[in-house]
Amino acid sequence: MNVLITGAGGFMGAYLAQLAESAGHSVLGIDTKEPETGTYTGAFDLCDVRDAVRIYETIAAFRPQRIFHLAAQSYPTVSMTHPFDTMQTNAGGTINLFEGARAAGINPIVVVACSSAEYGMVAAEDLPVREEHALRPLHPYGVSKVAQDLLAYQYFANYGIPTVRIRIFNTTGPRKRDDVCSDFTKRAVQIELGIRRSPMIVGNLTTRRAIIDVRDMVRGLWIAADHATYGEVYNVGSSNIYSGAELVEAIRPLIKVPFTLEQDPALLRTCDEPVIAGDTTKFRLCSGWKPEIELSTTISDMVEWWRNHLAPAAALSNSWARADEHQVVA
């Protein structure tokens, strides 16, 4: 089976490609950047989902039976300063993908990676949030994902393209960058390796997130193509919720040196949802899927990945320190 993955050069896309390849499928990944060395082994093309001509050509040539649409501008803070680019990538790119399938005369199963950011501010009594909850996003990124979500639905409703929309909740794991788990594990390992000194700089430690391992998430995306009802939308994530403070305490015993904390006001978002957690009952019932990897395992794997990734920088930093010390002694 031919499987097309947009955003394959990114964190989740590379894991999904590995899963599809391990099942014996022919995978083509596309992205605007090359995958990180050692994270992706399948066929890959540099292709921007905003480029309609390239998307049409790619789909017509590869003729996928399944498409996993993960390509996105996925940072809320970036969307605040680049709202047009965010909308063009997330909504416009989705249109190009579906129109490319229509132009090629194919009818692939399309799994669209939507977002929990679509819900925005949710009252405490409505948590964990269900799929039918009102969508009130708090930033252009969330708005762009609502547009993507509803565009995918209308391509099912109007053209019969078998589409499944997955509202993804906080996902992390080894190789992740620029989320709270990644930032905290990276900074802690930097302190351990002597690259930076304590205190560890943090932002808001009171926000709470349901956090799932990326390996569980991509398994859910794959299962969705087989078991979900076309045209439907599903929450996929963890049912376990953690505050930033709890994440720090999960990391602390894994680090070989003590460290303190210091809050940086620059890291505090002006539009940050206090709690993000979804009710995944609908997806679990239709698919039999459930998360299998404990947060402790995820955090431990992330710490180990950062140790390996940062070791060359630590060695260089230590060699400079020894050279400076030698000059002082001399």
Please identify what each model-predicted range represents.
Residues 3-22:
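N-terminal Rossmann NAD(P)H-binding glycine-rich loop of SDR-like oxidoreductase domains
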Residues 41-51:
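Rossmann-fold cofactor-recognition segment
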Residues 49-89:
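NAD(P)H-binding glycine-rich loop region in Rossmannoid oxidoreductase-like domains
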Residues 81-96, 103, 109, 117-165, ...:
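Catalytic helix-loop patch of NAD(P)-dependent Rossmann-fold dehydrogenases
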Residues 122-128, 150-209, 214-219, 225, ...:
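NAD(P)-dependent short-chain dehydrogenase/reductase
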Residues 199-204, 233-234, 243-249, 256-275, ...:
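C-terminal "lid/loop" region of Rossmann-like NAD(P)-dependent oxidoreductases
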Residues 217, 221, 236, 247, ...:
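Non-catalytic, hydrophobic alpha-helical segments
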Residues 295-330:
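Amphipathic terminal alpha-helices
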